[in-house]
C-alpha cells in the first residue's frame, strides 16, 4: 500500500545467531520480500545510523516498510546516540526529478490524442500533487478519473471529475475510460480492481505512465511513454513546459461533450 512504516523486532544475542537458539528466527530472510530494506545492527553504536537510514528509506521514493532487527545484547548495551547528518546507502537511489525529454513526449502524445484522459492513483496523494494535477487537467481540459486509492486526489465536484473507475467505480468514469485513446496514468500500479483484464485494457489505448517507482513501469501494462520521478515534481515540470508552449485548450471538445 506504499505506507511508510518502521518495524522493530528482537533477536537472539549476536553470538547465537545462526545456531538455532531458543526463539531465534530468520526474520530478515522472511521479511525481505515484503519490505524496502532490512537492517540488523550487530553493535550498539550501529543502532543510531540504522534508525536514521530506516526512516529515510521508509519515507523517500515510493514509501514502504523497513525492518530493524535488533539482537538482545545490542539492546542491553549502552552506546552514544549520535545520529549522523549524512550517510550512504549502497544500492538505494530514489528517483525524484523526471527526464525532461520524457515529459515532452508525454505532452506531445496528449496533444495529438483525440480522447485523452487522466487516471490519478494513490501516488498522487502521497506526493501531495493536488494543485499540479488540477492545473494539468484544466490547462488541457482533460477529464479525470481515479483509482480507489486515488480517490480524493482531484475534487469530485469539479466539472472535469468523473470519480473512481473499476469494479467499485462510477459508470460514467468506466465508460469514458473505455472510450479514451490515451491515458495519463499518475502514481498507479494498474490494479485489476481498477482496470480489469490487463490485456484488454492496454490494447485499447496509449499509456503514459508517471510513477516514482521504476519497477512499476511496464509491469502490468505496456507503456508508450514512461515518466519516472516524484509525481509532484514531474507534474510541475509538465505545467512549466505547457506554460512555455502557451498551450490552452477550450471546452468545445466533442470528447468532453
What do the PLM-derived regions correspond to, one by one?
Residues 1-256:
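N-terminal alpha/beta PP-like core and its mobile active-site loop of ThDP/TPP-dependent enzymes
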